Amino acid sequence: MKTSKILNTAAICLLAMGFNGNNVSCTNLNGSQEPAAANPVVSTPGNDAQQAGTQQGGANSKSVPEQQPQQAAGETTATVVVKTLDVLRGELRGQREAFLSEIIKSDGPFTILQLVGYLRVVDTDLLLKVDSTKVDEAGKKVKAYLEKIGIRGDSVEAALDNLMIKVYEITKGTVESSAQGTDSEELKTLLLKFSEDLKAEQELHSEAKGGEALLSSMKTQHDELLKKFAALTPTFLTSEDISGYLTVPEYGAPMNAAKWKKVEGMIHGKLESSEVPANLKALVAELIELREQMMDLLYGPIGHHDCAAGSGQGSSPKKPSFAAVPSSLSAIVFGIIVSMF
């Protein structure tokens, strides 16, 4: 079966939308198709007007002449409109502050995705200028809940780190019974639920159609960003800085969080300086958006409620877990991140 160019164009547009989410809009989609051998359309003076009205844009219509220049075989046209840095930062900030407001209104219990969501907000609060008052108020609620279930730390971030280490060890199957000996049975049960909820969320994304192609596109975008930043005179981010900022954190795993926080501070300082060129703002927008997309693939958008974990449903025991399947989205995304260095 032959696929028309208009369908190819639509497919490319949908892929772009899947990659950038609401960050793109597609217009001026057009294509052409070879005339069908059967049921040819015959144009007559009596029916030209009717056909133009009822078959406009139809794949078999020949009564309306092409308005665009003839395209080469396989060529498609799609206009992708990328949001400005200010618009992107505003939308991401609004998303995070709405999420924090939900946390502030609640005394718990919180799902693992809500707890991970708070970690993500803290990771980007400086660059996105998230309301610090809301960050602090939500942090108090999160810390109080963690203390209630038996997870403690000098700060809310430290307590969350302690929680995620336990969840990570369970998820990866590296935990030893003696290591969890001081945890109550209630906490052990809750940690298992957190682990299953995370796997359920990630399985949801690993089964998404086109996931591997999407990640391949992200790798390409990463490489292009390296070239664009290197071409700036002078540049303020090295290839190592960019790759460090795009390091996707697997919360609970051994990692150096200071790596991307340092780069976040560098970007923030640059944007706060006077007369930032438009081309630099555009590159920073691409960088921020790419990291957000990578995080969304692993943990879902901040504040979303349409996943298995959000509904309290864990992974089915008959279903291969996200962490155990080498071809899953997790293995692919971390493999691509490793290959970036």
UniProtKB/Swiss-Prot annotation:
Coiled coil: none annotated. Residues 36-75 are annotated as: Disordered. It is found in: Cell membrane; Secreted; Vesicle. Keywords: Cell membrane, Disulfide bond, Glycoprotein, GPI-anchor, Lipoprotein, Membrane, Merozoite, Palmitate, Secreted, Signal. Pfam families: Antigen_Bd37 (PF11641). A lipid is attached at residue 311 (GPI-anchor amidated serine). One of its GO terms (molecular function) is host cell surface binding. Changing residue 86 to A: No significant effects on erythrocyte binding. Gene3D superfamilies: Glycosylphosphatidylinositol-anchored merozoite surface protein (1.10.4170.10). It is a lipid-anchor; GPI-anchor. Residues 49-59 have a biased composition (Low complexity). InterPro entries: Bd37_core, Bd37_core_sf. The signal sequence is cleaved. Glycosylated. Glycans are attached at residues 23, 30. GO terms for cellular component: extracellular region; plasma membrane; side of membrane; vesicle. Residues 1-21 form the signal peptide. Disulfide bonds join 26-307. Residues 60-75 have a biased composition (Polar residues). Residues 312-341 form a propeptide. Vaccinations with the recombinant proteins derived from Rouen 1987/Rouen87 or Weybridge 8843/W8843 strains protect gerbils against heterologous challenges with Rouen87, W8843, Y5, 6303E and 1705A isolates. Monoclonal antibodies MAbF4.2F8 raised against the protein derived from Rouen 1987/Rouen87 isolate protect against virulent challenges with Rouen87 and Weybridge 8843/W8843 isolates but not 6303E isolate. Binds to host erythrocytes. This is Adhesion protein Bd37. The lineage of its organism: Eukaryota, Sar, Alveolata, Apicomplexa, Aconoidasida.
